[in-house]
């Protein structure tokens, strides 16, 4: 049984979120939550929230035992980028790229 949860349009770059996702892939959920809780990265908070949601989905919808769940797959895809302009000196302007990402966590009992 596989259960997934998604956070779409998360306000972090996919590159930064993937660093966190790579740390928990394939681990038991208890160990993964422990790692995410003590990680100093902003993306760890976002990934932890999605993992908690996936665990709750597995327990509520499938009646799964939390102690047997493992993080099956974690992937982070790029979302749309919001483009903003920052005025600079002498009439110039720079582009600010506000990147978003889609975080998906799959938990399974296998």
Curated annotation (Swiss-Prot):
GO molecular function: rRNA binding; structural constituent of ribosome
GO annotation terms (biological process): translation
Record field: transmembrane: none
A Pfam family this chain is assigned to: Ribosomal_L22
Record flagged with keyword Flavoprotein: no
Gene3D superfamilies, per database record: Ribosomal protein L22/L17
One GO CC term, this protein: cytosolic large ribosomal subunit
Record has Nucleotide-binding as a keyword: no
The entry's keywords: Ribonucleoprotein, Ribosomal protein, RNA-binding, rRNA-binding
Function: This protein binds specifically to 23S rRNA; its binding is stimulated by other ribosomal proteins, e.g. L4, L17, and L20. It is important during the early stages of 50S assembly. It makes multiple contacts with different domains of the 23S rRNA in the assembled 50S subunit and ribosome. The globular domain of the protein is located near the polypeptide exit tunnel on the outside of the subunit, while an extended beta-hairpin is found that lines the wall of the exit tunnel in the center of the 70S ribosome.
Subunit structure comment from the entry: Part of the 50S ribosomal subunit.
PANTHER family xref list: CHLOROPLAST 50S RIBOSOMAL PROTEIN L22-RELATED, LARGE RIBOSOMAL SUBUNIT PROTEIN UL22M
UniProt protein name: Large ribosomal subunit protein uL22
Organism of origin: Shewanella baltica (strain OS155 / ATCC BAA-1091)
């Amino acid at each position: 049984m596989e259960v997934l949860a998604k956070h779409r349009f998360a306000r972090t770059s996919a590159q930064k979120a993937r660093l966190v996702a790579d740390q928990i892939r394939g681990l038991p959920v208890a160990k993964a939550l422990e790692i995410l809780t003590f990680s100093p990265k902003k993306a760890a908070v976002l990934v932890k929230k999605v993992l908690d949601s996936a665990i709750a989905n597995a327990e509520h919808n499938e009646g799964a035992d939390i102690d047997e769940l493992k993080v099956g797959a974690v992937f982070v895809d790029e979302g749309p980028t919001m483009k903003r302009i920052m005025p600079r000196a002498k009439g110039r302007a720079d582009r600010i790229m506000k990147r978003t990402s889609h975080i998906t966590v799959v938990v399974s009992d296998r």
